[in-house]
UniProtKB/Swiss-Prot annotation:
Gene Ontology CC: cytosol
Cellular localisation: Cytoplasm
Record organism: Streptococcus pneumoniae (strain Hungary19A-6)
Protein name as catalogued: 4-hydroxy-tetrahydrodipicolinate reductase
Segments traversing the membrane: none
NCBIfam families referenced in this protein's UniProt entry, alphabetically: dapB (TIGR00036)
Catalytic activity, reaction form: (S)-2,3,4,5-tetrahydrodipicolinate + NAD(+) + H2O = (2S,4S)-4-hydroxy-2,3,4,5-tetrahydrodipicolinate + NADH + H(+); (S)-2,3,4,5-tetrahydrodipicolinate + NADP(+) + H2O = (2S,4S)-4-hydroxy-2,3,4,5-tetrahydrodipicolinate + NADPH + H(+)
Top enzyme category: oxidoreductase
Described purpose of this protein according to its UniProt entry: Catalyzes the conversion of 4-hydroxy-tetrahydrodipicolinate (HTPA) to tetrahydrodipicolinate.
Active-site residue list: 145 (proton donor/acceptor), 149 (proton donor)
Residue positions binding NAD(+): 9-14, 35, 89-91, 115-118
Matching SUPFAM superfamilies: Glyceraldehyde-3-phosphate dehydrogenase-like, C-terminal domain, NAD(P)-binding Rossmann-fold domains
Coiled-coil intervals: none
The entry's keywords: Amino-acid biosynthesis, Cytoplasm, Diaminopimelate biosynthesis, Lysine biosynthesis, NAD, NADP, Oxidoreductase
Length: 255
């Protein structure tokens, strides 16, 4: 039996890529799409909803969310309340919101996934960086995205820093008496690590994790040149969350 999928934010670039992926997979069935600004009532024969409240009680298994940080938490909560296992690629969640959604998913006996990045290479980058941080505590992150991205730093950069902080010796990166001649020049501070965000047209999603030690350096980098790179992870997420009973944060938990 096919997994019935709702896609929220279907008009965006990620939403459109997700729609095409679902439509070409015989194991998946796109049963509804959501966008508050869509004027048509159907898209390729699929019902279009403008208000998520109208989807309450709808027959579906999975809610895929590529909307905006402003509504992602409410959408995920709504999905869980209505029996849809959420697969969320929208970023901007606080740690408190993620913890609350995990607890609520267990109460609902529903699987779910919030993933800062669906590209398998990016997930591997985070794992490799975590291993390296045990031995190279001096590290900085540079994340680069298209100029339409609304949050900074990226969810991938934050997740990478969180994972490294769990194993890394907690030290302040840079000179103890350094002075910023322009505010923000050294980037955001996460547990002593610096995170730098670049926003330029022509980019999609890229990240470097740069480690330094006496007489040597190590650079890890991942590049997504096209949004199709995320669809393997989205597909995996859809097929895995229906088997599970709680929400997880990070695609690595499903690999």
């Amino acid at each position: 039996m096919s997994i019935r999928v709702i896609i929220a934010g279907f008009k965006g670039k990620m939403g459109q890529a997700a729609c095409q992926m679902v439509l070409t997979d015989s194991d998946l069935d796109l049963v509804a799409v959501l966008d508050p600004f869509e004027s048509e009532s159907e898209w390729q024969g699929i019902p279009v909803f403008k208000d998520k409240a109208d989807l309450a009680g709808f027959e579906a298994d999975v809610w895929v969310d590529f909307t905006t940080p402003a509504v992602a938490y409410e959408n995920t909560r709504f999905a869980l309340e209505n029996g849809f296992a959420p697969v969320v690629g929208t970023t901007g969640f606080t740690s408190e919101e993620i913890a609350e959604l995990k607890e609520f998913s267990r109460a609902q006996d529903l699987g779910g996934l919030i993933a800062p990045n669906f590209a398998l290479g990016a997930v591997l980058l985070m794992q490799f960086a975590t291993q390296a941080a045990k031995y190279f505590p001096n590290v900085e992150i540079i994340e680069l995205h298209h100029d339409k991205k609304k949050d900074a730093p990226s969810g991938t950069a934050i997740k990478t820093a969180e994972l490294m902080a769990e194993v890394r010796e907690s030290i302040q990166q840079g000179a103890a008496d350094e002075e910023e001649l322009i505010a923000g020049a050294r980037g955001a501070d996460f547990d002593g690590m610096r995170i730098h965000s670049v926003r330029l047209p022509g980019l999609v999603a890229h990240q470097e994790v740069i480690f330094g030690n006496q007489g040597e350096g190590l650079t890890l980098r991942h590049d997504s040149y096209d949004r199709i790179s995320f669809m393997t992870g989205v597909n995996l997420g859809i097929k895995e969350v229906v088997k599970r009973h709680e929400l997880v944060y990070g695609l690595e938990h499903l690999l």
